[in-house]
Regions:
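Cell-envelope/extracellular polymer assembly enzymes that use nucleotide-activated donors
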Residues: 19-21
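Acidic helix N-cap motif at the loop->helix transition within catalytic regions
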Residues: 31-35, 56-65
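Short beta-strand-to-loop acidic/aromatic patch adjacent to the donor-nucleotide binding site
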Residues: 94-104
Length: 244
């Protein structure tokens, strides 16, 4: 028997994780996505990246990284990209667990390992990451505007409170086939996260949260943490009636 390293003992063996598929929505992430996919692929060999109508070389970067590539001819939004990726992944032989994973380097493989481990060992259908799951100094690293928006979403959503979620718009989620087969996101924009919450509640999916560390870099901040982005999250949910 060959010796195992600490990563494998923690569930990081790529062979063991062949039943896990990472779904990575991508829009104009050509400068970073290759490194993100290569890093994740060392632990999770099955990755599908959905190029959501990018105008840069994202598709070429995805090819170089060795991930599966699905392309939208035009930009449809993150919700549509996730739905496309889940539909692709759930049709692959042996797929049991599914992960929504950001293309910009914010999410960490170590958190995915922990969340997958919980699905394997606990009676839950979906584990959602939270930036607010434990008292820690790192919470201060969440941009102020982002914190205000996320807290407002929880306050306005009875379903979110009923499910005990503290960070409904966290893009790091791990779920089983029951969720993957029942997922039918109709909101293409940022409000798909609130729609996820609605589906959790209406389908009776067993939900858990896991504290995660989000890496806020200068690049990721420029892509998605602005005041306009926060306003869009709220307006999409309210107009689309996705803050039930």
């Amino acid at each position: 028997m060959r010796p195992t390293g600490p990563d494998e003992e923690a569930g990081g063996d790529p062979v063991r994780n062949r039943d896990v598929w990472l779904i990575v929505p991508c829009f104009n992430e050509g400068t970073v996505i290759e490194d993100v996919l290569r890093n994740a692929g060392e632990t999770f060999p099955n990755i599908v990246a959905v190029d959501d109508g990018s105008a840069d070389d994202s598709a070429a970067a995805i090819h170089r990284a060795g991930a599966h590539l699905v392309r939208h001819p035009v930009n449809l939004g993150q919700g549509a990209a996730i739905q496309t990726g889940v539909e692709y992944a759930r049709n692959q032989p042996g797929a049991r667990y599914f992960v929504t994973f950001d293309a910009d380097g914010q999410h960490q493989v170590k958190d995915v390992l922990t969340m997958v481990g919980r699905l394997r060992s606990e009676p839950v259908d979906i584990v959602v990451g939270t930036r607010f799951g434990r008292p820690r100094a790192e919470d201060d690293q969440v941009p102020l505007i982002k914190r205000l928006v996320l807290r407002t979403v929880v306050m306005l959503s009875p379903r979110t409170r009923r499910l005990g979620l503290t960070d409904a718009h966290n893009g790091l989620r791990v779920f089983n086939r029951r969720v993957a087969e029942g997922l039918n996101l109709r909101m293409n924009g940022m409000s798909h996260a609130s729609e996820f919450v609605e589906l959790m509640d209406s389908n009776g999916w067993r939900v858990a949260e896991e504290p995660v560390d989000i890496l806020y870099t200068e690049y990721s901040m420029s892509k998605g943490q602005s005041l306009l982005n926060g306003i869009n999250i709220l307006s999409d949910g309210i107009v689309g009636r996705r803050l039930p």
